[in-house]
Regions:
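Active-site-proximal acidic secondary-structure segment that organizes catalysis
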Residues: 108, 120, 161-211
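Acyl/amide activation-and-transfer machinery of modular secondary-metabolite enzymes
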Residues: 23-41, 82-105, 180-186
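Hydrophobic "lid/gating" helix adjacent to the active-site nucleophile
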Residues: 48-85, 187
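Flexible, Gly/Pro-enriched loop and linker segments at secondary-structure and domain junctions
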Residues: 1-31, 51, 129, 136-180
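Helical lid/core segments from catalytic subdomains that handle acyl or acyl-like groups
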Residues: 91-149
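Short alpha-helix boundary/capping segments
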Residues: 46-47, 192
Length: 211
């Protein structure tokens, strides 16, 4: 986990960081609607898992926006070189297990590690918590394919010093002009603002529209 400490005294967000860090609930969230038609068609043609594809797309976008690589360690802001994935997987008994997947520069390379990681996670009991699933250099992902939600909240321990973004995808919905999917984005306000979430959402949509 390679990271660099940010110089708080010279950081333009110094006041913002200190202001929001004092709050009991420093996270804020928005829900956006993603156009999924091109990604769906591409995955169908290539034989790819759509869910793995949009999880990768979100991670690619997050790594492009520096503030999504910011974390708080020992009360201080740092920036990681690379951010990975920690997602939930549904098990046969309808419970879920945490699954770590390392990011890669291209989708095929990502799949080579993600697929065996997912298989190994499903074989674990309970929540499947490991050192990797607790990594701070990751984004927490969840998928609710049954619900076309318009907003979403997360279970959280306020005493735990969490600063990882949380991204959730919903139900794929067919409409007259194509397919859409809700995506909820929750981030730590001490590390970023709505502008940065907007950058992320645009880059995510751009990736989904690539093919």
């Amino acid at each position: 986990m390679d990271w660099t400490a940010l110089d708080l005294e010279s950081w333009a967000r110094k006041d913002h960081f200190e202001f929001f860090s004092r709050m009991e609930e420093p996270f804020f969230g928005v829900t956006v609607q993603l156009d999924m038609q091109k990604a769906y068609d591409y995955c169908k043609a290539q034989g790819y898992s759509l869910s793995l594809y949009y999880l990768y797309a979100a991670s690619w976008a997050a790594n492009q926006v520096e503030s999504f690589r910011y974390r708080i360690i020992d009360g201080k802001p740092v920036v990681f070189d690379v951010i990975h994935l920690n997602a939930v997987q549904l098990k046969e008994d309808k419970s879920f297990v945490f699954t770590y997947m390392p990011f890669a520069a291209d989708y095929e390379s990502f799949l080579k590690k993600a697929i065996p990681e997912r298989k190994a996670a499903l074989a674990r009991s309970g929540l499947g918590i490991t050192e990797d699933t607790m990594r701070v250099d990751s984004i927490h992902y969840s998928v609710l394919p049954w619900i076309d939600f318009s907003s979403l909240s997360h279970a959280r321990s306020y005493s735990h010093p969490d600063s990882c973004p949380k991204i959730s995808f919903g139900k794929l919905v067919k409409e007259k002009d194509g397919l859409r999917m809700p995506c909820a984005i929750h981030v730590h306000h001490a590390l970023m603002d709505g502008y940065h979430v907007g950058l992320f959402a645009d880059k995510l949509q751009d990736f989904l529209n690539r093919h």
